[in-house]
């Protein structure tokens, strides 16, 4: 793809890991991205507080390069409380109380694989091993859940899934809840494994369908079957 000087300049301003930037170039130069940039700029001009901090918006992609992805855990949008969101779905910064969904995830992990329940909720260790912790929407206004939906992020993360579909195989996609499952309809199930369950939020999980889903053991079993190093799900203290 031959780029003009203007296009190269636009790409240079995107703080994105190189393998993802190359693969997502058509989207990064699309009207969707222009519109999204304008929206975020207007939010900042209006002095709105946006989470996660700008340097962490693309954390999921920057920590887990395209050719390192083994697993995708799809979330909806970032936590909207102070010091929570760190750019990884379901993850929070160290020192922050565990959100209820993450507490349920840790309980399921403990029941499934006997992994001790972590006192902190920073999932960076998973991301570094190839777990792409991808929210559908990558930003949110402080205290306003879902406030940045339908501004272009959904199309961006659809493009991420499409790149994985086309360029990779034997990835495990973990889709918790109806929202993630709808978004995951575009995944090629002949090339990848798709695991579904209810959402880990207390409201959904307590109705049944999340606890006992055993996605962590099923993920590692599939990876081993395809000669791929399994994930060490235990977080450091």
Curated annotation (Swiss-Prot):
Predominantly, its location class is cytoplasm
Q: What's the EC number here?
A: 3.2.2.27
Q: What class of enzyme is it?
A: hydrolase
Task: Indicate the secretion signal residues.
Answer: none
One GO CC term, this protein: cytoplasm
Q: Where in the cell is it found?
A: Cytoplasm
- Which keywords belong to this entry? Cytoplasm, DNA damage, DNA repair, Hydrolase
The catalytic site is made up of: 77 (proton acceptor)
Q: Which reactions fall under this protein's catalytic activity?
A: Hydrolyzes single-stranded DNA or mismatched double-stranded DNA and polynucleotides, releasing free uracil
What's a BP term from Gene Ontology annotated to this protein?
Answer: base-excision repair, AP site formation via deaminated base removal
Q: A Gene Ontology MF term for this entry?
A: uracil DNA N-glycosylase activity
The reply to whether Nuclease figures as a keyword in the UniProt entry is no
Q: Belongs to which family?
A: Belongs to the uracil-DNA glycosylase (UDG) superfamily. UNG family.
NCBIfam families with a match to the protein in the record: PRK05254.1-1, PRK05254.1-2, PRK05254.1-4, PRK05254.1-5, ung
Q: What does this protein do?
A: Excises uracil residues from the DNA which can arise as a result of misincorporation of dUMP residues by DNA polymerase or due to deamination of cytosine.
Protein's recorded name: Uracil-DNA glycosylase
Per the UniProt record, the source organism is Acinetobacter baumannii (strain AYE)
Q: What is the lineage of its organism?
A: Bacteria, Pseudomonadati, Pseudomonadota, Gammaproteobacteria, Moraxellales
């Amino acid at each position: 793809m031959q780029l003009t000087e203007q296009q190269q300049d636009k790409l240079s301003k995107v703080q994105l890991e190189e393998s993802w930037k190359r693969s997502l170039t058509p989207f990064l130069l699309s009207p969707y991205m222009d519109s999204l940039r304008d929206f975020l700029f207007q939010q900042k001009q209006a002095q709105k507080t946006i989470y996660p901090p700008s340097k962490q918006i693309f954390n999921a992609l920057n920590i887990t390069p395209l050719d390192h992805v083994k697993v995708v855990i799809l979330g909806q949008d970032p936590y909207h409380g102070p010091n929570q969101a760190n750019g990884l779905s379901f993850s929070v910064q160290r020192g922050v109380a565990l959100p209820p969904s993450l507490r349920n995830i840790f309980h399921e992990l403990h029941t499934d694989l006997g992994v001790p329940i972590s006192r902190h909720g920073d999932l960076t260790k998973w991301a570094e091993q190839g777990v792409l912790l991808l929210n559908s929407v990558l930003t949110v206004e402080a205290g306003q859940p879902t406030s940045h939906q339908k501004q272009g992020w959904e199309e961006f993360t659809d493009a991420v899934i499409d790149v994985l579909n086309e360029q990779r195989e034997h990835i495990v996609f973990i889709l918790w809840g109806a929202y993630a499952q709808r978004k995951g309809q575009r995944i090629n199930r002949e090339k990848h494994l798709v695991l579904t369950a209810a959402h880990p939020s207390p409201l959904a999980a307590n109705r049944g369908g999340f606890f006992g889903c055993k996605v962590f053991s099923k993920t590692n079993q599939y990876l081993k079957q395809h000669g791929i190093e399994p994930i060490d799900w235990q977080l450091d203290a």
